[in-house]
Amino acid sequence: SSTDANRKNFAKTAITFMKDWGFDGIDVDWEYPADATQASNMVLLLKEVRSQLDAYAAQYAPGYHFLLTIAAPAGKDNYSKLRLADLGQVLDYINLMAYDYAGSFSPLTGHDANLFANPSNPNATPFNTDSAVKDYIKGGVPANKIVLGMPIYGRSFQNTAGIGQTYNGVGGGGGGSTGSWEAGIWDYKALPKAGATIQYDSVAKGYYSYNAGTKELISFDTPDMINTKVAYLKSLGLGGSMFWEASADKKGADSLIGTSHRALGGLDTTQNLLSYPQLT
């Protein structure tokens, strides 16, 4: 993204990929601009993609608006480098990755996707969603362009006495407990595990399961948590919810996506574009 030629080529090839697969827009996941120069180049890149999307639409899909979105960080060290007001102008939505607040990379156990900080147990809440959302809005992003991301998985900590405490391992390495697709990460449909009881931190707004026998703690969202998050995002006028990722969900009443759908009152009903005359 450091040169105009590179930005033009990125936009051109991304749009080719979009039309060849019949997508309705482009989502850019840049993790993460490391300094002011990269943050500026990110804005220039997105403006070039927006320009080429509009040019393609004008020629081949008159009246249609292709979406341009990004996956955005919820950690202040990362989002404080971004040009938030500029992003709020050029983008249709900012999909806030409001998860992975704690995991194998953490010194202590913690919530994976809590809404708020817990001053009485700060070790359990090194990050929180509310601070990130408020900072994005304060930085110039329209609230209705912020889409709140929610995890459909849990993060495990082993050999621990509880949340915000020391642990030893997350699974794997011959320890018996591994994960659904990565050591220490469990699909929501596999939770809670047998023998574990679900606990709720009413200050941080975060659920986790704990097995006193195996000393395993897993932080994950429940349907009740999704209802709480939807009420929160509606109270701030945010743009909706998004999830990572659908294959990990449960069916029926326990579905996290289904819970969000019911709480929000429906899905996005924007019509898909069905005609791509330049299809290669």
Tell me what each language-model feature is.
Residues 2-20, 76-87, 129-133, 220-234:
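Short, acidic/polar
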Residues 11-40, 100:
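Active-site groove signature of glycoside hydrolases
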Residues 24, 92, 239:
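Receiver (REC) domain switch/active-site residues of two-component response regulators
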Residues 31-188:
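Substrate-binding surface in catalytic domains of secreted glycosidases
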Residues 37-40, 44-46, 51, 55-58, ...:
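Short acidic, glycine/proline-enriched helix-loop-strand junctions
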Residues 102-105, 109-120, 150-232, 258-280:
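Glycan-binding loop/region signatures in secreted carbohydrate-active enzymes
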Residues 150, 242-247:
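Active-site proximal loops enriched in glycine and acidic residues that flank catalytic Cys/His/Asp
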